[in-house]
């Protein structure tokens, strides 16, 4: 604190003792206090006074008598009071004959408040009081102006008071003049910023005179503010430190006021101003305060701000530790709500919006004090730049403050909703009481904070708090998204059981990625696909139908009810037998082919035409396209003329095979179970032509509608295995209408001439064998009697099962066997008895020719009248 003595020298005190010594040295008659009141033994007082740096420009007269009292508190807040007494030359030093000028300093960080109270001590007497010259400047850092109380006289006791003249000079060149009329405002020049032009301070001057036996003394309240005037709200933040509210006036910190604006508010009490001067009516305080009250300040005015009261009472209403005042924090909370839209505009997607809003409260106030003409955009720009240069450690205080404000906002919203619940349905007081109980635990935590006091009144008297929150509802509605997490936390505390279940359900799809699920589904489809087909033919057909569906865009997924009904029907043997009997062979052929190209439209039309045909007509119709396909696909077997030559070649082949010894002759036919058809146990190569496969499949497809097939069907349809066994010569597949395929082992001697003739015989056998299914199944005699002549040995015989037995073996999907189960001859001693097994045994091509043209054809014709016409054609061709 710099003080100029009578000689004009300035001194600075660094500590409490130095401050005392300086005052003693430069002020002759100084009464120091016996003790300094404070809560710490440090030199906070001296440091705070030194930060104020009051430097008077002039000190007209020395201070004969000075009484000082100081009060220290934490957070750099203090109140310092000078009691200055000036005695004239003829008056005594008694309190009753002196006029005291009391200077009160209230300091908080960069905000200082000086209150000057001039009052006579006791009863006034004759005489005039010389000038009192305390020079005081409440300015952070630099000296801007001087407040000087010039000499004034007190009139003799009488009916009226003497004139009062006080002159306060703001800068050296532009003094502030207070006229005698209390309604005249103070005027100052525009260059009131002083030499430095930096800094801002508020000086509150309260001048109170008590003369004579006047009951209600006159009180004057002057507010002198230097160039950057910004009225501060009670408890506003100044540089990050909470400062106490002003003693007299309060306003918002953001609204800039014109430079060098000085507002003078007066309030006259009983009595007159001066003798001979009219006493004008005192203007109401509301008419003088609006220019300095911000619209954003919703806080009430402190009591005693512009009314009667001594300095002690004024200071008692604004204690130094005003940071704990709920009213000041509540106003900061409202300012924070007003600043949040500004912060969101600059940081739309940042989570620092609430903290930045808290940061704007002190920064915008400081900027407005330094430069009141600064626009809001410029202030926000400077604040944002300051925020970017602020470290994370310094930001923590604003984050904590924002967290508390969010809690207050959430609590306020809850109070509003509760008031609505209480006001709306009057018949729900019992449900409302349990809702208040869960709020009990968070209440003590927030009660520790001083700001919770306004919201604390909500639960006690919700009906009385209904009107105040009403105007705040629009503000809180816009702020609903931030406090929602706090509300969720409360609900989690209320309902612990259901909350853990919901996250568990939502975490299930997050833990298992969809790619893994799809991969699992694909693997299961690959694993379960063959197993489903192995259970039976109906399931295999349905599975293949489902596989074809994604390939055909026109098809739609089947109905689950329809599928269950189909499964039920497929479980019935009679239904399966009937379905297999009427399945179109072309459809099965195309379905089982490697590259199917089905014409569903033509197939559907053809099936519609076949609905009106009888069984015999249907058989004939199916034989015609089979012949055409036979000629188109098999070049050696084109036309019926080839069948005539095939009989002679076939007979020659029979003679050639008879000459071959039994061990080396063609192989006996042995039955191959369905499980072993897919593999070649002998290690022989699997070679077959697509032509033979197509011809064999067509032949076996046509066998399904024969009466023998419909008479008896197998219980378990064969699998859709598609292996091939080596054939004779060219290894073409030979299909017989028997239930199981047979393999023909290579037992022919190497280098024999018969091996070269077998390829042509195999083609002939393939072409002639396709005619067998239409009359061979109807033979009533056993196959051994049909195909084995007496001169053949036991290994040169062919065995064919009876009609009933063959019907059972032909029932399972002939098409599947036509495509993938070729039959080959192998020698087997089964001539004497018919084979009861699933397949038929063929010892060679001789048996096939013998069965085609042998004496058993007459018996077969007798057994099957439906195919007699076809048999005649075959006999003619042979």
From Swiss-Prot:
Comp. bias intervals (Pro residues): 278-288, 427-444
Domain of life: Eukaryota
Biased composition (Basic and acidic residues): 537-551
Extent of the signal sequence: none
Pfam families on file: NUT
TM stretches of this protein: none
InterPro entries per record: NUT, NUT_N
Compositionally skewed regions (Basic residues) per UniProt: 476-487
Family: Belongs to the NUT family.
Protein's UniProt name: NUT family member 2A
Gene assigned in the entry: NUTM2A
């Amino acid at each position: 604190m710099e003080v100029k003595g009578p000689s004009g020298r300035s001194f600075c005190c660094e500590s409490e003792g130095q401050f005392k010594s300086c005052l003693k040295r430069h002020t002759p008659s100084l009464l120091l206090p016996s003790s300094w009141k404070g809560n710490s033994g440090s030199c906070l007082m001296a440091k705070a006074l030194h930060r104020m740096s009051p430097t008077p420009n002039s000190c007209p007269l020395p201070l004969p008598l000075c009484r000082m009292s100081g009060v220290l508190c934490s957070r750099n807040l203090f109140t310092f009071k000078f009691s200055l007494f000036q005695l004239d030359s003829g008056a005594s030093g008694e309190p009753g004959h002196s006029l005291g000028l009391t200077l009160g300093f209230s300091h908080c960080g960069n905000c200082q408040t000086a209150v000057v109270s001039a009052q006579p001590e006791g009863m006034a007497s004759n005489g005039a009081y010389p000038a009192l010259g305390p020079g005081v400047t409440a300015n952070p850092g630099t000296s801007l102006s001087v407040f000087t109380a010039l000499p004034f006289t007190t009139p003799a006791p009488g009916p009226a008071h003497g004139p009062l003249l006080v002159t306060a000079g703001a800068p050296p060149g532009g003094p502030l003049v207070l006229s005698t009329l209390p309604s005249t405002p103070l005027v100052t020049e525009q260059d009131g910023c002083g030499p430095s032009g930096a800094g801002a301070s508020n000086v509150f001057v309260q001048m109170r005179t008590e003369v004579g036996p006047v009951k209600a003394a006159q009180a004057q309240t002057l507010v002198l503010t230097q160039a950057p005037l910004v009225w501060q709200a009670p408890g506003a933040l100044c540089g990050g430190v909470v400062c106490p509210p002003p003693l007299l006036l309060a306003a918002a910190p953001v609204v800039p006021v014109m430079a060098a604006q000085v507002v003078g508010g007066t309030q006259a009490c009983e009595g007159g101003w001066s003798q001979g001067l009219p006493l004008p009516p005192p203007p109401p305080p509301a008419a003088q305060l609006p220019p300095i009250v911000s619209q954003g300040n919703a806080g009430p005015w402190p009591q005693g701000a512009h009314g009667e009261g001594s300095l002690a009472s004024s200071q008692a209403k604004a204690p130094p530790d005003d940071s704990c005042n709920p009213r000041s924090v509540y106003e900061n909370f409202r300012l924070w709500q007003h600043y949040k839209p500004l912060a969101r505009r600059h940081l739309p997607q940042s989570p620092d919006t609430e903290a930045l809003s808290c940061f704007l409260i002190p920064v915008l106030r400081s900027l407005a004090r330094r430069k009141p003409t600064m626009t809001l955009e410029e202030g926000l720009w400077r604040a944002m730049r300051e925020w970017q240069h602020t470290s994370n450690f310094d930001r923590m205080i604003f984050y904590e403050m924002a967290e508390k404000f969010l809690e207050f906002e959430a609590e306020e919203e809850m109070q509003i909703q509760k008031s609505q619940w209480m006001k709306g349905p009057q018949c729900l007081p019992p449900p409302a009481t349990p809702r208040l109980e869960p709020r009990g635990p968070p209440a003590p935590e927030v009660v520790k904070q001083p700001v919770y006091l306004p919201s604390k009144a909500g639960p006690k008297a919700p009906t009385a708090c209904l009107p105040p929150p009403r105007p705040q509802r629009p503000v809180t509605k816009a702020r609903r998204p931030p406090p929602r997490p706090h509300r969720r936390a409360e609900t989690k505390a209320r309902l612990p059981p259901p909350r853990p279940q919901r996250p568990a359900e939502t975490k299930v799809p997050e833990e298992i990625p969809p790619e893994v699920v799809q991969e699992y589904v694909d693997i299961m489809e690959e694993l379960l696909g063959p197993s489903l087909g192995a259970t039976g033919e109906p399931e295999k057909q349905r599975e293949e139908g489902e596989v074809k569906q994604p390939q055909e865009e026109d098809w739609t997924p089947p109905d689950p009810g329809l599928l269950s009904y189909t499964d039920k029907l497929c479980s019935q043997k009679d239904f399966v037998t009937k379905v297999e009997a009427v399945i179109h062979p072309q459809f099965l052929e195309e379905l089982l082919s490697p590259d199917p190209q089905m014409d569903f439209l033509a197939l559907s039309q053809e099936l519609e035409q076949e609905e009106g045909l009888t069984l015999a007509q249907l058989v004939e119709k199916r034989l015609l396209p089979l012949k055409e396909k036979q000629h188109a696909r098999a070049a050696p077997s084109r036309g019926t003329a080839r069948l005539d030559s095939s009989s002679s070649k076939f007979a020659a082949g029979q003679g050639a095979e008879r000459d071959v010894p039994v061990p080396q002759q063609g192989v006996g036919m042995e039955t191959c179970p369905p499980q072993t058809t897919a593999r070649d146990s002998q290690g022989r190569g699997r070679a077959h032509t697509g032509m033979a496969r197509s011809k064999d499949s067509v032949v076996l497809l046509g066998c399904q509608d024969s009466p023998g097939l419909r008479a008896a069907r197998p219980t378990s349809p064969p699998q859709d295995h598609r292996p091939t066994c080596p054939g004779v010569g060219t290894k073409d597949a030979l299909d017989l209408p028997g239930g199981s395929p047979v393999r023909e082992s290579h037992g022919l001697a190497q280098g024999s001439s018969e091996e070269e003739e077998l390829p042509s015989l195999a083609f002939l056998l393939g072409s002639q064998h396709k005619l067998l299914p239409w009359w061979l199944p109807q033979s009533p005699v056993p196959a051994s009697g049909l195909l084995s002549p007496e001169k053949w040995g036991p290994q040169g015989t062919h065995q064919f099962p009876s009609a009933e037995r063959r019907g059972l073996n032909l029932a399972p999907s002939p098409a599947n066997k036509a495509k993938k189960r070729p039959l080959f001859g192998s020698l087997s001693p089964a001539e004497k008895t018919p084979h009861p097994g699933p397949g038929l045994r063929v010892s060679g091509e001789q048996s096939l020719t013998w069965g085609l043209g042998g004496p058993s054809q007459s018996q077969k014709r007798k057994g099957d009248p439906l195919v007699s016409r076809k048999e005649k054609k075959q006999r003619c061709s042979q």
